[in-house]
A protein has these predicted regions:
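Metal-cofactor-binding active-site regions of metalloenzymes
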Residues: 2-213, 222-227, 234-239, 245-262, ...
Length: 391
């Protein structure tokens, strides 16, 4: 069973105490939708720019934050994407890419993210002549170093870009095939959605599917549900990035529900791009309550100014999602990952045990020395069912 029918205060009329942010930070988590070039540290951008003699719109932290618009409401996806013009300036060398990938995984580890899938478009990092293979290997090296240092497992999703060309996307798909089994676990199509339909990139997706590689597509973020239908039926996507406008097509929504197609929800980012008016009107809770497989992700840690812990906390406090359902969403993240099945099963078992240490109100049921409290006989809802069903 995918989720529990927990009542919140909006339903039963009783005020439920909010779970503290520190609890969300302590929980084991995934981040399945995070862009490398939108998730740098401001300090790193300044240091790399100075070392590489790269011009920036500002030379201090606050000025750079304002220039990128970290955490701002941009009003459209196109405006939101302008910040990448700044970050990409310092992402054109092997050393920079290795460092940035390592630091992203390090930041994720600090909030107890156990597994993440880092996505980026290698062709955007060749502005100074860096070979595509060197781009891919530098990022993989950084993520590998983070795993050796912290134990966090971070894999790669290679992206094509809607608004560049179908030929470029095919080249990125070839890279994904070349690095299959070497750290690359999937292929994606990102970029401006309106006027750049996924069907134009069908050949790239045919190539990755012919080579048994997982794929996800940004769809239903800045365009209607027909974009989602095209991603699923024309390109064969296994997951949908964002999917905010899926709610406009009930029949399609039922199809995704029936086929257990996961949604990579990125709530704060969706507000900032204008995909939704505010968090209260985000469809995430609707999707979950209808039984769809919902995961919670960052999108861009820097540009959105967020973390997985923050997103989960906002889903709980601003959308009224009960803590018991938050735990189900966390497990859905592990279940929806592009890990091999046996690794997914093992992760679900471990994480399920950890989540079961908390009751439905975020109260830790076991003491620090590992002994059970007298309340620990009450098992939190949903974990056992989700762990047992890793498909």
């Amino acid at each position: 069973m995918e989720h529990t029918n927990s009542n919140d205060s909006a339903v039963n009329g009783t005020a439920q105490p909010q779970v503290p942010f520190e609890v969300f930070k302590a929980l084991p988590k995934t981040d399945l939708h995070v862009h490398l070039d939108g998730s740098l540290r401001l300090e790193t951008i300044l240091e790399l720019a100075k070392a590489e003699k790269v011009e920036l719109p500002a030379n201090d932290i606050e000025g750079l934050r304002a220039a990128i618009g970290c955490g701002s409401n941009f009003g459209s996806l196109v405006e939101y994407l302008r910040g990448f013009d700044i970050t990409l300036r310092v992402m054109q060398t092997e050393a920079a890419l290795e460092r940035i990938a390592f630091e992203l995984a390090e930041d994720a580890h600090r909030e107890n993210v156990r597994y993440m899938e880092v996505r980026y478009a290698p062709m955007l990092h060749t502005q100074r002549g860096l070979k595509l293979t060197k781009v891919v290997e530098a990022v993989l090296d950084g993520l590998r170093r983070a795993r050796e240092t912290y134990g966090i497992k971070a894999t790669v999703i290679i992206c094509g870009i809607r608004n560049i060309s179908a030929e470029s996307s095919y080249q990125m798909a070839e890279l994904a095939v070349a690095y299959k089994g070497r750290g690359v676990v999937g292929f994606d199509l990102a970029g401006a959605e309106a006027d750049f339909p996924a069907k134009h990139h069908r050949a790239a997706f045919q190539l990755v599917r012919d080579n048994n590689i997982n794929c996800t597509i940004h769809a239903g973020e800045a365009y209607g549900p027909e974009s989602i239908a095209q991603a699923i039926h024309v390109c064969g996507a296994h997951r949908i990035g964002h999917g905010c406008r899926l709610r406009e097509d009930g029949d399609l929504m039922q199809y995704l529900n029936d086929h257990r197609v996961p949604l990579e929800c990125c709530p704060s980012s969706n507000v900032q791009t204008g995909a939704v008016k505010d968090l209260a009107s985000h469809p995430l809770k609707l999707y979950f309550d209808l039984g769809l497989r919902v995961t919670v992700n960052t999108d861009n840690r820097l540009i959105t100014d967020t973390s997985v812990s923050k997103e989960l906390y906002l889903v709980h406090t601003q959308m009224g999602v009960p803590f018991a359902d938050i735990k189900s969403m966390i497990l859905a993240g592990f279940k929806s990952s592009f890990q091999p099945f046996h690794e997914k099963q093992a992760a679900l078992r471990r994480v399920g045990v950890e989540l079961d240490k908390y009751d439905d109100h975020g109260v830790l049921l076991t003491s620090q020395n590992g002994t059970s409290s007298e309340r620990s006989s009450r098992r939190p809802r949903g974990s056992a069912e989700l762990v047992a069903d890793a498909e």
